[in-house]
Structure formats: C-alpha cells, structure tokens
C-alpha cells in the first residue's frame, strides 16, 4: 500500500506559486477613442492658467494670524 504525503516544503512551494500567480496584472479591454475633428483646437487648456496667481495673504490666513495673536502665539 502506498500513500502520498505532502511535506511542508511541498506546501510552501504551492503557496509561493499561488502568490506569484496573483501578482499578475489585470488586463483591461482596449478603449476606442473618437477621432478628433479637423476644426478642433490643438491647444486645449486643461487646467487653470492662474494657479500660481493666488495671493498668499488670503482672508483665511489673516483670520488665522489674528487668532494666533490673540492666543499669544508668535507669528513669523
């Protein structure tokens, strides 16, 4: 009578193999994008042009500095 025994080494190999298989990346379907019309503008603005024009002295920062002064905290 023969019996099959599974050793810890064999179990470890099976676990490592499963982990390796799970690390594969999921493949996504190819997306179809519409063709661009001839009259469309090449320079599309996708963000605000004035992003760095914000003032550093906003109403919030003024109120915060005032509250810190009231609390006795030094302000740089």
From Swiss-Prot:
Query: What does the record note on quaternary structure?
Result: Part of the 26S proteasome.
Whichever gene encodes this chain, its name is dss-1
Tell me which Gene Ontology terms the entry assigns under biological process.
double-strand break repair via homologous recombination; embryo development ending in birth or egg hatching; epithelium development; intestinal absorption; mRNA export from nucleus; oogenesis; positive regulation of multicellular organism growth; positive regulation of protein ubiquitination
* Top-rank taxon: Eukaryota
Where composition is biased (Basic and acidic residues), the residues are 7-20, 57-70
Stretches the record annotates as Disordered:
1-28, 52-76
> What UniProt keywords apply to this chain's record, in alphabetical order?
Cytoplasm, Developmental protein, Nucleus, Proteasome
Instruction: Name it.
Output: Probable 26S proteasome complex subunit dss-1
Q: What is the lineage of its organism?
A: Eukaryota, Metazoa, Ecdysozoa, Nematoda, Chromadorea
Q: Which family does the entry's similarity section mention?
A: Belongs to the DSS1/SEM1 family.
* PANTHER family, A to Z: 26 PROTEASOME COMPLEX SUBUNIT DSS1, 26S PROTEASOME COMPLEX SUBUNIT SEM1
